[in-house]
Regions:
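A hydrolase-biased, glycine/serine/histidine/acidic-enriched motif that marks catalytic-domain neighborhoods
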Residues: 14-17, 24-319
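Short, Lys/Arg-enriched alpha-helical microdomains
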Residues: 9-11
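Phosphopantetheinylated carrier protein domains
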Residues: 1-7
């Protein structure tokens, strides 16, 4: 019943917390904590499995996986996750050393929650946070299994303006971006990024996009037209392009649609500024079967070299 009444994982997780606490969410002092306990460690278990989402910040990326893990009758591990969009301190902190600073604070939250043994899994930018959290946990004497990163790619492209970031955001939340006026073809975007990525030290200006020609002229014309709308108008169109049966966003998320975009954009900039430092723990690097990315597919082949800059110990790349 709880899952039916609370269709997204965040709503369902809060429902579980409310039931276990025996009080309403309005009375819960932990409501604003970025650490969400999806399922506590079963009796006899020792390990908390902790998930870190990508740049979008919330946990709907893990919906299906959480349901499978929680429903496993032989489960011996707890399941938790960090939701950046619930973390006011995260949203208000500076960008310099952001990922390192947040990783240390998240390690403190895990330790103060009473857990001692961890498996950390991070998707995309969340992989960087998982590494920094693991670093702090190891320094504190905790037992940390090999950190799993999924599509944690080096971010080297910096954009002028928001046009392509808005398209990427729309794809991440399940919007039909073509209905919002964006170019539909991912391949077209990939070709444009491939062409522009080595110019101006990876900084892509809006004029560079507008001046694309030949088979990329469709993309140039699309974004010249998009530029004629205000940012608010573009985001409203993107919001309207989300299907009614979409399971990516909760009702509260929709109310914060523009704010979540700013969080997404900010996380991207923080990832650009991240400099890998030697990490004494073990790493397992995984990639999604779907090799297409809604934004930076041309960067994906650099994943292994990027993580090698971190790994002092064992780095295993899982094909």
């Amino acid at each position: 019943i709880g899952m039916l009444q609370n269709p997204t994982i965040m709503e369902f997780a809060q429902f579980l917390i409310t039931v276990e606490a025996g009080k309403s969410s309005d009375d819960s002092q932990d409501f604003d904590s970025p650490l969400n306990i999806i399922a506590d460690i079963p009796e006899g278990g020792k390990t908390m499995k902790v998930f870190f989402p990508g740049g979008i910040g919330f946990l709907q990326q893990f919906n299906s996986l959480f349901q499978i893990l929680v429903g496993n009758p032989n489960r011996t591990e707890g399941i938790a996750a960090f939701n950046y969009t619930e973390d006011r301190e995260y949203l208000n902190s500076g960008e310099k050393e952001h990922i390192v600073t947040v990783g240390r604070r998240y390690a403190d939250l895990l330790i103060s929650s009473g857990y001692k043994q961890f498996k950390l899994i991070g998707y995309c930018m969340g992989g960087l946070l998982a590494i920094e959290t693991a670093r702090a946990l190891l320094e504190a004497g905790c037992n940390v299994y090999p950190v799993v990163t999924i599509d944690t790619i080096p971010i080297v492209l910096e954009m002028e303006g928001d046009l392509l970031m808005e398209r990427s955001y729309g794809l991440m939340i399940g919007a039909d971006v073509s209905k919002a006026g964006h170019v539909k073809s991912d391949n077209l975007v990939q070709q444009a990024l491939e062409l522009l990525k080595d110019k101006d030290n990876g900084y892509i200006t809006e004029n560079a996009i507008f001046n694309l020609s030949g088979e990329l002229e469709e993309l140039a014309n699309c974004y010249k037209k998009q530029k004629g709308f205000s940012k608010k108008e573009r985001l409203d169109k993107l919001k309207s392009a989300i299907p009614e049966n979409n399971m990516q966003l909760s009702r509260d998320d929709l109310k914060r649609f523009d704010e979540l975009f700013e969080c997404y954009k900010r996380n991207y900039r923080c990832a650009i500024n991240y400099i890998p430092k030697p990490f004494a723990g073990e790493l397992r690097a995984m990639s999604c079967i779907d090799e297409n990315s809604p934004f930076v597919p041309v960067m994906k082949p650099g994943t292994e070299d990027f993580l090698k800059k971190c790994a002092l110990s064992n780095l295993q790349v899982v094909p």
